[in-house]
From Swiss-Prot:
<dbReference type="InterPro" id="IPR047089">
    <property type="entry name" value="Asp-tRNA-ligase_1_N"/>
</dbReference>
<comment type="similarity">
    <text>Belongs to the class-II aminoacyl-tRNA synthetase family. Type 1 subfamily.</text>
</comment>
<dbReference type="InterPro" id="IPR006195">
    <property type="entry name" value="aa-tRNA-synth_II"/>
</dbReference>
<keyword id="KW-0030">Aminoacyl-tRNA synthetase</keyword>
<comment type="function">
    <text>Catalyzes the attachment of L-aspartate to tRNA(Asp) in a two-step reaction: L-aspartate is first activated by ATP to form Asp-AMP and then transferred to the acceptor end of tRNA(Asp).</text>
</comment>
<dbReference type="Pfam" id="PF02938">
    <property type="entry name" value="GAD"/>
</dbReference>
<keyword id="KW-0648">Protein biosynthesis</keyword>
<dbReference type="InterPro" id="IPR004364">
    <property type="entry name" value="Aa-tRNA-synt_II"/>
</dbReference>
<dbReference type="InterPro" id="IPR012340">
    <property type="entry name" value="NA-bd_OB-fold"/>
</dbReference>
<dbReference type="GO" id="GO:0140096">
    <property type="term" value="F:catalytic activity, acting on a protein"/>
</dbReference>
<dbReference type="InterPro" id="IPR047090">
    <property type="entry name" value="AspRS_core"/>
</dbReference>
<dbReference type="InterPro" id="IPR029351">
    <property type="entry name" value="GAD_dom"/>
</dbReference>
<dbReference type="InterPro" id="IPR004524">
    <property type="entry name" value="Asp-tRNA-ligase_1"/>
</dbReference>
<comment type="subunit">
    <text>Homodimer.</text>
</comment>
<dbReference type="Pfam" id="PF00152">
    <property type="entry name" value="tRNA-synt_2"/>
</dbReference>
<dbReference type="GO" id="GO:0006422">
    <property type="term" value="P:aspartyl-tRNA aminoacylation"/>
</dbReference>
<keyword id="KW-0436">Ligase</keyword>
């Protein structure tokens, strides 16, 4: 084999009248009037190669044997195409290579699907033949984009004195958060390592060790139910610092993201990002990760409807709940009664009992609940800024149910009504988070982020007496309705960390058993510290304009956490189980 001159997709005017050696895959072969044209593809793109029997009979005869996905090496001269043959849709559309020599490096069977973007192949088949799927230009470009993101991040953090430090994959299982993936120890029978859900404690210990600024682009593992933007193994951009305020950590983060946007998309974004408290986000958008690319907001109408004779509204208000509305401007004729019934069923997954609604017509409000609101119709129209052609949708229940239901409806309407400007990248900080959430099923408070989050100084005294009122030095960065990442200042004294564990229901013995190494470390002069972790997969997905992180991961799992290509997970041999002292008692095939 001869040395390659350049990539197929990089053939340009620089190579005119020069001889080049190209290597790649046959995208397409055409025989036109005795002249063979091959579209030769590699990771950088496609170039047209011409085989004229008058130029080289031997090369023409070999080219005639080529079929799609054959791997070939071509030598020839780069020339300009005739004007009528220029293809403006191709990066190399002005040029072609007049071949003088060709070598078939490997043949290929007929592929189970065509190697092109618009092939309408189901996801399971794509994943079974992932190595073929990755040859498609869109997938190749997604993986290259991901590389550009990580390259830019490393460059930025290196330039700001962050150290890239690896942390262990084999660690200790802890009860907080999602389920762990466990790894049995052969040497220590009955004992298990856990694959890390994040390097949280290790990066805190690195701060205690004095490294000051740490980062790692690190693989993490969570055994949880999957959805479009989640995988059992995923990649975090993990950052930790000492002696910085939340605002300083946020500044580093947003400047890093601005650099990523500039390098990958050629877009200059404004910094600092807007900031919004958690309470404000929930009140205005019904979401802690609002999509601010469109303006529809939740409207509190409790004062307007507090005296109406509608039991649903009254019951909610009497029990300390909320009554809120959404105004879908100009959407009345787009949603039938059946559509509204379907929306009512949709919100049931968020705990709502239904979705009340009204349409604004020339002669007033019309709909299933209009008769209950006759006396306040003018006030309701004013409060919601309603006009003829609008449709009002109402949630009445516990505050968290109203927020979740209407927030989800808002997001759905934004997509269905085409309200979202897909060209926008709206970044946002959500700050001032509650430190705890109440788990109804467990009957106790759990960490809203993780148990190492620093409470706001003014709230510490209420940790034991009123946990629900305690706020955290925590912050999430949001992009277009997706949580990109979250961070916080961390607890750096043993006394406060023990109080935190106590509030979460740990006994002293449990805390020492599970987190004793951290508690002991806090006795040795731990500095104030904090950081953030960002989802690389999700960031790459949004930059690529995809809707599923599988599209930016080279070898992902499917919705059942299975790799259809290599059939992982799989059964293992009895000998392997015996060596690990594991007895599998029952398998549901």
């Amino acid at each position: 084999m001869e040395k390659r001159t350049t990539y197929c997709g990089n053939v340009s005017a620089e190579f005119i009248e020069k001889e080049v050696v190209l290597k790649g895959w046959v995208q397409k072969r055409r025989d036109l009037g005795g002249v063979i044209f091959i579209d030769l593809r590699d990771r950088e793109g496609i170039v047209q190669v011409v085989f004229n029997p008058e130029k080289s009979k031997e090369a023409w005869e070999i080219a005639d044997k080529c079929r799609s996905e054959y791997v070939i090496e071509v030598k020839g001269q780069v020339v300009y195409r005739d004007k009528e043959a220029i293809n403006p849709k191709m990066k190399t559309g002005e040029f072609e290579v007049m071949a003088t020599d060709i070598t078939i490096l490997n043949t290929a069977k007929t592929t189970p699907f065509t190697i092109e973007d618009d092939n309408n192949v189901n996801d399971e088949l794509r994943m079974k033949y992932r190595y073929l799927d990755l040859r498609r230009p869109s997938m190749t470009n997604n993986i290259k984009l991901r590389h550009q993101v990580t390259k830019t991040i490393r460059h930025y953090l290196d330039n700001h004195d962050f150290l890239d430090i690896e942390t262990p994959y084999l660690g200790k299982s802890t009860p907080e958060g999602a389920r762990d993936y466990l790894v049995p120890s052969r040497v220590h029978a009955g004992h298990f390592y856990a694959l890390p859900q994040s390097p949280q404690l290790f990066k805190q210990l690195l701060m205690g060790a004095g490294f000051d600024r740490y980062y790692q682009i690190v693989r993490c593992f969570r055994d949880e139910d999957l959805r479009g933007d989640r995988q059992p193994e995923f990649t975090q951009i993990d950052i930790e610092t000492t002696f910085l305020t939340p605002e300083e950590i946020q500044t580093y983060t947003e400047n890093m993201l601005a650099e990523v946007m500039k390098e990958t998309k050629g877009i200059e974004i404004s910094v600092p990002f807007p900031r919004m408290s958690y309470d404000e986000a929930m009140a205005r958008y019904g979401s802690d990760k609002p999509d601010t690319r469109f303006a529809m907001e939740l409207i509190d109408v409790a004062e307007v409807v507090k005296d109406v004779d509608f039991k649903v509204f009254q019951a909610a208000l009497e029990n300390g709940g909320h009554v809120k509305a959404l105004n879908a401007k100009g959407a009345a004729d787009k949603y039938s009664r059946k559509d509204m019934d379907n929306l009512g069923k949709y919100v049931s997954q968020f705990g709502a009992k239904g979705l009340a609604w009204l349409k604004v017509e020339e002669d007033g409000l019309k709909g299933p609940i209009a008769k209950f609101l006759t006396e306040v119709s003018d006030e309701l129209i004013a409060a919601t800024n309603a006009e003829v052609g609008d449709i009002l949708m109402f949630g009445a229940d516990k505050p968290e149910i109203v927020a979740a239901a209407l927030g989800a409806v808002r997001t759905r309407l934004g997509k269905e009504l085409g309200l979202i400007d897909e060209s926008k990248f709206n970044f946002l900080w959500i700050v001032d988070w509650p430190l705890f959430e109440y788990d109804e099923e467990a009957g106790r408070y759990v960490s809203a982020h993780h148990p190492f989050t620093q409470p706001k100084a003014e709230d510490v005294d209420r940790l034991a007496t009123d946990p629900a009122s305690v706020y955290a030095e925590a912050y999430d960065v949001v992009l277009n309705g997706y949580e990109l990442g979250g961070g916080s200042l961390r607890i750096h004294t043993r006394e406060l960390q023990e109080k935190m564990f106590e509030t979460l229901g740990f006994t002293k013995e449990e805390a020492q058993d599970q987190f004793g190494f951290l508690l002991d470390a806090l006795d040795y002069g731990f500095p104030p510290h904090g950081g953030i972790a960002l989802g690389l997969d999700r960031l790459a997905m949004l930059l690529a304009g995809e809707e599923n992180i599988r599209e930016v991961i080279a070898f992902p799992k499917n919705g059942k956490a299975i790799d259809p290509m290599n059939n992982a997970p799989s059964l293992v041999s009895p000998l392997q189980l015996f060596e690990l002292n594991i007895d599998v008692t029952a398998i549901d095939e």
